[in-house]
């Protein structure tokens, strides 16, 4: 487990990988910068009403089969039954007005499902960092668990984003350039740029590092038997 930090205002922050989540925290911020929650934010910006976070590819396909109007997306190359891939560059031109998206990714959706019993689950990346921090400042929880989804909690881009949001949530100034620089030099960014992964657009890394591109936060909560992500409007101070 990565070390916890208590800031001078009293917010206790814990940074963990998915395997270390354990008992459901009261408040969880699930971070996946490259690319699940950057993609989710873009989906909402393109008009999606909600995103169902699927636990497996089979579940995603079953949800799509149950309602063919749903838009199913996944990591990697496009495969039968899916409509889109987990790429902000490829998704940013999609018309998702009023649609329900079903998302299954390697890390982000897994992390959100791991904390589904938390009283508040925020899903985040740099594109919604300040909005996420404002929700935390408004709620002023005593304890916040940041789930660093990539590389079992060691992904530089996710940890940088989590620590940035934690500082902003505590009301501290933060050198955004330093945090973004760490993310830009991460293994995930390198693999995306070098074409190691499939289902990638050349602009993906740049889009994932657009700080505060969107004014909303993203809140996941159980609805019936599903974990559903929705945008949450956050008034600017």
Swiss-Prot record:
Keyword terms: Hydrolase, Magnesium
Molecular function terms from GO: 2-phosphosulfolactate phosphatase activity; magnesium ion binding; sulfopyruvate decarboxylase activity
Swiss-Prot/TrEMBL catalytic activity: (2R)-O-phospho-3-sulfolactate + H2O = (2R)-3-sulfolactate + phosphate
Class in the EC hierarchy, top level: hydrolase
EC number, UniProt record: 3.1.3.71
Database matches in InterPro entries: ComB-like, ComB-like_sf
Cofactors demanded by this protein: Mg(2+)
Source taxon at top rank: Bacteria
Family classification: Belongs to the ComB family.
Name of this protein: Probable 2-phosphosulfolactate phosphatase
The species this protein was found in: Streptomyces coelicolor (strain ATCC BAA-471 / A3(2) / M145)
Gene: comB
């Amino acid at each position: 487990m990565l070390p916890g930090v208590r800031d001078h205002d009293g917010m206790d922050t814990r940074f963990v990988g998915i395997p270390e989540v354990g008992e459901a925290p009261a408040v969880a911020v699930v971070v996946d910068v490259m690319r699940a929650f950057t993609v989710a934010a873009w989906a909402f910006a393109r008009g999606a009403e909600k995103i169902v976070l699927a636990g497996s590819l089979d579940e995603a396909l079953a949800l799509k089969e149950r309602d063919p109007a749903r838009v199913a997306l996944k990591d990697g190359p496009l495969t039968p039954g899916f409509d889109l891939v987990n790429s902000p560059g490829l998704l940013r031109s999609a018309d998702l007005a009023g649609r329900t998206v079903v998302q299954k990714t390697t890390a982000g959706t897994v992390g959100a499902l791991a904390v589904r019993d938390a009283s508040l689950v925020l899903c985040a990346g740099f594109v919604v960092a300040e909005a996420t921090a404002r929700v935390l400042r408004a709620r002023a929880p005593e304890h916040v668990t940041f789930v660093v989804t990539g590389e079992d909690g060691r992904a530089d881009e996710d940890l940088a984003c989590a620590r940035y949001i934690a500082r902003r949530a505590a009301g501290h100034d933060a050198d955004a350039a330093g945090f973004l620089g760490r993310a830009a030099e991460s293994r995930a960014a390198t693999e995306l740029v070098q074409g190691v992964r499939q289902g990638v657009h050349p602009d993906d890394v740049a889009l994932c590092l657009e700080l505060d591109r969107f004014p909303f936060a993203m809140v996941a909560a159980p609805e019936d038997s599903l974990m559903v992500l929705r945008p949450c409007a956050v008034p600017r101070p």
